[in-house]
């Protein structure tokens, strides 16, 4: 099934006229879940028993802090993706925008209007949930029309909007069916259609593809991109999947433990990660990390690992000089696709060779560091076996240098 992209642009095709665009501003937003009776002692004891989870819990005298110091300006018609591991606060943030969670502190503005205390129904937003949230006893048509009926929209207008949305999503043939007769992908289309007919200022999506299998998820991801161009509104999308974030977002907000780690375009967060967490979270396979030495010689910078030494690029040297970075021990990051098998360089032992079709993923051990090297099959001169010794190198232009003390990228 595909979105109906053969139609004329929506403005010419009778799209719902009321769809408007909006800016969204979140200013120093904080969310604390207060303790209920007896819960404070339990939470503190849990943190003491599991010290490795203290940061995730963020237990204070106020309660459990879910989101902190969250500030973001979302432009008109922008597609923003909130991404991060489970428990990072991304869904909580989305629910605060929707009005489903109270904001403990900070300001939320939609089109310049403060909406902290405005109920969800009056915020002019629509939300698509992970579990579809369809009424099982209603047909697809009735599900899509339900919110409009509650607003006492005339029947003729309801019919027009429902059929327009159904045509966009290519679900016209299912309008008389009930949800149980639909596949997961078709149900998700209905959930999206129900949001479209409301003509919202802001469209919110909370992990809408996570219940789908991998193949259908890939198809729906591409079609959400097409849909975004058709309805032309502001999107805030939540996911834990960095592939979804990279392919869908105009900008990505990467979160961890309730804090924003970095905001940027997909290219910015991939090529210039702000810290060790972002570097390891964005990109598949994950970035390789090494204990290394950063060496400054005048205005030149070199990195040295396992006896291999290379100079950083002029752009990186310029940024390090601006920050007056001195020689120090660092965590060095290099992506697998930027790591090359070579005649000389860092020595490593092959542990696993994964044939991926157009490339081989070599899993090697270099002085205790697990390293992945992506080798294009066109560059292979033979097969790699477990126990083989290989050497790898990398260019200074693709090396990322992180502080051992703070985990921050030293170029920032």
Which sequence ranges carry the predicted segments?
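The feature captures the beta-strand-to-loop junction immediately N-terminal to the Walker
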Residues: 83-85
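Helix-to-loop junction immediately C-terminal to a conserved catalytic motif
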Residues: 98
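Pre-Walker A (P-loop) beta-loop-beta motif of ABC nucleotide-binding domains
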Residues: 70-81
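Conserved ABC transporter NBD signature motif
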Residues: 106-114
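ABC ATPase nucleotide-binding domains
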Residues: 120-281
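Non-catalytic connector elements of ABC transporters
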Residues: 2-3, 38, 287, 297-412
